[in-house]
């Protein structure tokens, strides 16, 4: 089965959106604290990737009762974003993920290298 077949609601907290958009204060904070940030190319790319994952994404990871999230993802043929490193290097990203809170259906999107590995 593809796509997200449950009711979901976009989590509109700016902190969850801005941390994945280039040139925001959230990204600058991540670079200072963690030395890297995973960002989409721009807001339009974030919105497009989100819609495609909602329609065609695959559930990832194993069913983990201790994990509060469900994850859906999809590989794209063109880069959707990059990892920005503090020293200035970039790694292109081709995988997008929607992370959904199991109990509320609230979600946000993340550009990644690959699906998250769950234990």
Language-model segment annotations:
Residues 3-119:
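Functional cores of ribonucleases/endoribonucleases
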